[in-house]
Amino acid sequence: MFHAFPPLYVYSGVSASRLLIGLLAVSAVAADARLDSLLKAVEGRYNRAKTLQVVFHEDYTPQGKPRRSESGTLQLRKPGRMRWDYDQPKGKLFVSDGKYLWLYTPAENRAEKMKFQESEDMRAPLAFLLGKLNFEKEFRNLEGKAEGADTRIAAEPRTENLPYSAVEFLVTADGRIKQVKVTGFDRSVLDFAFDQEKVDPALDGKLFQFQVPKGVELVEAGQ
């Protein structure tokens, strides 16, 4: 009995397809391994640090409105303390003492006070740097993409009880965070660029305390 066999090019096509699938699978595993290694480098860098200081540039773009740019110096101290000193606008201050957040705006002659956990300010995502940084615990759907010599890591928060829906980190090969982009549920975007990072500088605890200046209006959240 005569048996018809598929042409040789059919076998070649099947073999090539299987080879391609295999190569893609190996490539995906290698990419995942590289991303995992980079995430561990970032975690190690910031989990070991007790204090941190960086110069920041901040762009805030509300949905359908013009972008607003601000800049200054950010100082962090574990546990739970941070201080944003703004050069632009001059005198603006955002402080956390680990329990409360304070926002002082000289141009409005007003200071706002709120509990740290109740804050919906989108600077709050950076607070994870004040504790034990764990990407797998804090975020889901982590993806990495090369951007020059750096890697852009995209992620979503695991909990929905936060004012943002997505975060991106631009990270150097040695685990330094150069940029953080936060997208809110209202589609507003807050983009931070960091430079001149100093790990474990001496920071006085008084930097993270705030006294309302005389004559300034105090607004307390929930009051």
Spell out what each predicted region is.
Residues 1-15:
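N-terminal secretory signal peptides that target proteins for export/translocation
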Residues 27-68, 81, 212-223:
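N-terminal leader/targeting segments and the immediate start of mature chains
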Residues 73-124, 190-191:
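An acidic-aromatic
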Residues 69-71, 89-90, 97, 162-166, ...:
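Short, surface-exposed coil-to-beta transition loops
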Residues 17-27:
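Bacterial N-terminal signal peptides
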Residues 64, 107-109, 186:
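Solvent-exposed strand-loop boundary residues in beta-sheet-rich modules
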Residues 37, 112, 134-223:
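Gly/Pro-enriched, hydrophobic low-complexity segments
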